[in-house]
């Protein structure tokens, strides 16, 4: 008799992984979660806290940062990256993340590794204040190399229709406030891995693999606090494409983001990458360069917003301004 296990799919290992994952997921449950894990679908009740609720959704993955996790055999932080990439995106439109789903794919399932991945996703959900209400683990023999996984996530948030932030209120002279990143976050790792091949190399007192695996910062709670008190005009999550691609995504009209390069506090890891042969312009077009999230606001709100972010434990400062006309980003 030929069994599913003979083809490379271990059902028992799948059951074991689900059991391990459930404990992490249940810790993220918030009011609104209706059913437990294991159903055919996750359910969430919107509730009465919104006048005209709009669902805002986003999906993303961790990319080749996973290769660093494979090489160092540290799997419990990349799940935070997965959550962060999704919730920070929907935050840009003023949405509060309410629930999350994950997707793990592999060639051969190892329950403990899958559990570590979900542990990170769960931690990210806790940081964002949303519930991990479901997911999928796909074991596909021969499709992925043994020991390799892919990880993706799906976030859904809520915002009242009249509070959607879409860039339509941005004006000439508005200020741009940058919130510091925790490091490289989750973009540019294909380039990083071309330059750095020994993850045991020492860098500032740590193994560079450990530095590269620093989780993406989740900005949800400090930014939602800002939105309670200030009229934010636009927001941008600095991901793939760096400053040049992401900051203009908040604009609806013809505007240029003028960035004061001297104001930026560029972390050592980016200076190290540039020292390996990446020119500055390319770096700003690839990495976050120390700024993971940007808020656009009126000049009179600048000090209050920065103070609020600092109260939440974030490092934030003015990095530039909006100029009417043209398009894109000018770094000078």
From Swiss-Prot:
<dbReference type="Pfam" id="PF02769">
    <property type="entry name" value="AIRS_C"/>
</dbReference>
<dbReference type="InterPro" id="IPR016188">
    <property type="entry name" value="PurM-like_N"/>
</dbReference>
<dbReference type="GO" id="GO:0005829">
    <property type="term" value="C:cytosol"/>
</dbReference>
<dbReference type="InterPro" id="IPR036676">
    <property type="entry name" value="PurM-like_C_sf"/>
</dbReference>
<keyword id="KW-0067">ATP-binding</keyword>
<comment type="pathway">
    <text>Purine metabolism; IMP biosynthesis via de novo pathway; 5-amino-1-(5-phospho-D-ribosyl)imidazole from N(2)-formyl-N(1)-(5-phospho-D-ribosyl)glycinamide: step 2/2.</text>
</comment>
<dbReference type="GO" id="GO:0005524">
    <property type="term" value="F:ATP binding"/>
</dbReference>
<dbReference type="Pfam" id="PF00586">
    <property type="entry name" value="AIRS"/>
</dbReference>
<dbReference type="InterPro" id="IPR004733">
    <property type="entry name" value="PurM_cligase"/>
</dbReference>
<keyword id="KW-0963">Cytoplasm</keyword>
<keyword id="KW-0658">Purine biosynthesis</keyword>
<dbReference type="GO" id="GO:0004637">
    <property type="term" value="F:phosphoribosylamine-glycine ligase activity"/>
</dbReference>
<dbReference type="InterPro" id="IPR036921">
    <property type="entry name" value="PurM-like_N_sf"/>
</dbReference>
<dbReference type="GO" id="GO:0046084">
    <property type="term" value="P:adenine biosynthetic process"/>
</dbReference>
<dbReference type="GO" id="GO:0004641">
    <property type="term" value="F:phosphoribosylformylglycinamidine cyclo-ligase activity"/>
</dbReference>
<dbReference type="InterPro" id="IPR010918">
    <property type="entry name" value="PurM-like_C_dom"/>
</dbReference>
<keyword id="KW-0436">Ligase</keyword>
<keyword id="KW-0547">Nucleotide-binding</keyword>
<dbReference type="GO" id="GO:0006189">
    <property type="term" value="P:'de novo' IMP biosynthetic process"/>
</dbReference>
<protein>
    <recommendedName>
        <fullName>Phosphoribosylformylglycinamidine cyclo-ligase</fullName>
        <ecNumber>6.3.3.1</ecNumber>
    </recommendedName>
</protein>
<comment type="similarity">
    <text>Belongs to the AIR synthase family.</text>
</comment>
